Amino acid sequence: MTTTTTEVTFSTTTTGVGIITLNRPKALNSITNNMVTAMLQQLKQWQNDKATSVIVFKGSGEKGFCAGGDIKTLASAKEGDEQFNNAKQFFVDEYELDLLLANYSKPIVSLLNGVVMGGGVGLTQGTSHRIITQNTKWAMPEMNIAFFPDVGGVHFLNQAPGYTGMYLALTAKTIRAADILYIGAADFYVEDLRVLEQKIVDYDWTTVEEADHKLDELIGSLAAVPPRGELAALQNDIDDTFHLYSVEDIVAKLRDRGDAFGDEHANILLSKSPVSLKVTHKYMLDYAHRSLEDTLNMDVVVAMNFLRNNDFYEGVDAVLIKKHQSPNYDYPTLEEVDDELVDSYFKA
């Protein structure tokens, strides 16, 4: 059986597999509100369907699983109350979907090929079996558009080793296979997702009592070791600098090092929105031990406050629309972003 919308497709097999395919390859499968609504409805239906035992989650095309939310549409929120309310509804629904996927009662195999960023990470971070390849490019890149790592990012980035989560949140660095495994953002590395998907689809799940264990066995038979990554070797440098209690102190510490790591990363931070840096830094510290649900609830509050302020629209315009890379922020320096302003982003 196959159900199709223009942007996401759902199908089932006689072997007990439900398949979700994000279907906007020209937009790197970035998700729209229609897609989110459709997935919520279908996943709730499958949850109560005894004929469906395993979910496979993938993106169409060769370039990516999902590049995130449809940010250009969200950027229209400044045009009026209707657009603003539509943006809020998107966030509410998206975060509900993220929580449903993370708490789903059946195993979900996420095939993370190519670009997996932002909202794409949020969709799959809590799923039971996250599979990556040599082509996977993973990031929480929201800092690049004067936003913050939403979709529960503060929750799962805080679970990474040492201060790697803070590092990735503030720098928006893109990481590859070994580093994705290192921070706990994937479970298996395989050479060929097509072979794995075919094995899953061909296996008869209708007679299996513990599908999770059988999936571990099946995927494990194809698992490989990825090329060496970078984060483990940088762990001491990251912990030496990104543990500090203000963004200004982090930048100063990086500058004081007088080495390539310090210079590179000080410049990276100073290229970001000062508001985004400070709000994200505080959020990472204050919510380090909060649940995913608590974090997603706060994400709605923080996201809407970003949409009430101009710097987000400047960031989107500079990076995604006009692409001149020179945003004219209302708060262009860290010193201009005081604690009162930062605190206001956490108030509904």
Located regions from the model:
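Glycine- (often His-adjacent) and acidic-residue-rich active-site loop
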Residues: 59-93
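Amphipathic alpha-helical blocks and their helix-capping loop/short-beta junctions
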Residues: 185, 191-268
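Short, flexible helix-coil linker/hinge segments at the edges of structured domains or between repeats
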Residues: 83-87, 131-160, 200-204
